[in-house]
């Protein structure tokens, strides 16, 4: 069958493509840049932006399934930029699916869509979107997710996946940022360091996307129009971070900063960044980051296991062993 994927050159996207190719499917990747590696694999690559609705429609014609993994992911930025990419871009994806009669859409969401200002311990998919979000990224993803869920009908079956803190070889986001901050002496434990989270090895995340597609084909009445949490946990966040740091021959993070101070500092940084129009950078702290680094956020994954047949094949210790030291 023919699969179309946005963000195919990204961390998760490449792993989804590998698994699709292993199963014998044809793959078209739609990304903002060309990736020679994908072309060597025999993947058809289209260079395009999610805002280019006509190119998105023409290039996804005659495909059987659409994996939408691309999004603007950042801890800070202009609200309109998040909205343009994550919401308008997803609307363009939905139109392309509808116009081209693509029957299955798998949307990569995030657990952050339900994270507000308090801990989540084993919450399931009945959790509502929070009234107030401290993340422009999470807010835009929640809006997009809701649109994908509502688009599910007899012509197009949709499912949303919420993978949490994906890690593994090839990661250019999570682990590199942690290591860079630590090398500069800027990484501190926020709160008491006992908070627990979900993490997820990238190959397990990719497998869930393939299984979600198969579930849409085989039992659309059960899976269609639903969201599913994905994770391997809970684990203590700072213990996990220190395992990664140790693997890179660096000393552990030991210094702490109280949550309230970090949260207020994040608020000040956001305020002054907004005032001077500084958006395209990685701020040392935001309110959302302070919350994420200090609070529990782990979820119940039983629905993904029951409905999708998803069971993580690679455990966390094995996943950590697969990390490439750079």
Predicted regions and their residues:
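Amphipathic terminal alpha-helices
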Residues: 299-307, 311-326
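Conserved Rossmann-fold NAD(P)-dependent oxidoreductase catalytic core, especially the SDR/UDP-sugar
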Residues: 88, 92-136
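NAD(P)H-binding glycine-rich loop region in Rossmannoid oxidoreductase-like domains
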Residues: 39, 43-88, 96, 116
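Alpha-helical substrate-binding/gating segment
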Residues: 179-187, 197-250
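N-terminal Rossmann NAD(P)H-binding glycine-rich loop of SDR-like oxidoreductase domains
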Residues: 3-23
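Glycine-rich "substrate-gating" loop/helix at the edge of Rossmann-like oxidoreductase active sites
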Residues: 134-135, 164-172, 192-204, 231-233
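Terminal hydrophobic/aromatic helix or amphipathic segment near a protein terminus
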Residues: 245-292
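Catalytic helix-loop patch of NAD(P)-dependent Rossmann-fold dehydrogenases
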Residues: 119-166
């Amino acid at each position: 069958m023919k699969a179309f994927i946005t963000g195919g050159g990204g961390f998760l996207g490449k792993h989804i493509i590998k698994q699709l190719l292993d199963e014998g499917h044809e793959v078209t990747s739609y990304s903002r840049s060309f990736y020679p590696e994908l072309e060597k694999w025999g993947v058809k690559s289209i260079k395009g932006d999610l805002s280019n609705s006509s190119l998105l429609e023409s290039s996804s014609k005659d495909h059987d399934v659409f994996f939408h993994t691309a999004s603007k992911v950042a801890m800070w930025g202009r609200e309109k930029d998040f909205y343009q990419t994550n919401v308008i871009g997803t609307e363009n994806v939905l139109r392309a699916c509808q116009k081209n009669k693509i029957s299955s859409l798998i949307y990569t969401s995030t657990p952050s869509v339900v994270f507000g200002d308090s801990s989540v311990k084993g919450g399931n998919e009945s959790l509502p979107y929070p009234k107030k979000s401290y993340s422009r990224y999470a807010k835009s993803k929640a809006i997009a997710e809701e649109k994908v869920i509502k688009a599910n009908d007899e012509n197009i079956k949709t499912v949303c996946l919420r993978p949490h803190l994906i890690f593994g070889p090839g990661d250019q986001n999570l682990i590199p940022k942690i290591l860079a901050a630590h090398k500069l002496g800027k990484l501190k434990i926020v709160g008491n360091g006992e908070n627990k989270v979900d993490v997820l090895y990238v190959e397990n995340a990719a497998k869930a996307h393939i299984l979600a597609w198969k579930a849409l084909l085989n039992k659309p009445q059960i899976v269609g129009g639903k969201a599913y949490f994905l994770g391997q946990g809970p684990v203590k966040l700072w213990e996990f971070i220190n395992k990664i740091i140790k693997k890179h021959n660096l000393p552990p993070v030991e210094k702490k900063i109280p949550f309230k101070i970090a949260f207020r500092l994040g608020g000040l940084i956001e305020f002054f960044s907004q005032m001077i129009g500084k958006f395209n950078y990685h701020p040392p702290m935001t309110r959302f980051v302070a919350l994420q680094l200090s609070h529990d956020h782990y979820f119940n994954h039983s629905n993904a296991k029951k409905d999708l047949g998803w069971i993580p094949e690679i455990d966390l210790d094995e996943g950590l062993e697969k990390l490439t030291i750079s």
